[in-house]
């Protein structure tokens, strides 16, 4: 049981770490996603940095997108994750529409 707790503790921080790393390096990765969604531009890359990583970092990505979009990213990683279900991106003028 103790071992399990330790593993959980280690797992948790790792996720947080990944979130941070993703937020930083995802901007570049998001470039492809942004372009695929219609090329939002620089801001799109920053907004979608966490969104594209919807694989579980939707928490970070959602927060970022909502903050930058003005709180209209209710569907952070709802379907595509990459673009918050096509609703968050519409805030920055780059509607994914996927």
From Swiss-Prot:
Top-level taxon of the source organism: Eukaryota
GO BP annotations listed: sorocarp development
InterPro entries from the UniProt entry: HssA/B-like_chaperone, HssA/B-related
Chain segments annotated as coiled-coil in the UniProt record: none
Region (Disordered): 1-29
Record-stated family: Belongs to the hssA/B family.
Name of the protein described by the UniProt record: HssA/B-like protein 36
Organism: Dictyostelium discoideum
């Amino acid at each position: 049981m103790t071992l399990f707790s330790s593993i959980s503790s280690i797992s948790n921080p790792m996720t947080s770490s990944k979130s941070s790393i993703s937020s930083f390096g995802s901007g570049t990765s998001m470039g492809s996603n942004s372009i695929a969604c219609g090329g939002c531009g620089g801001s799109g890359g920053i907004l979608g940095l966490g969104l594209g990583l919807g694989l579980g970092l939707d928490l970070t990505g959602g927060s970022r997108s909502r903050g930058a979009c003005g709180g209209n990213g209710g569907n952070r990683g709802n379907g595509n994750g990459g673009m918050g279900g096509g609703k968050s991106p519409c805030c920055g003028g780059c509607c994914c529409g996927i």
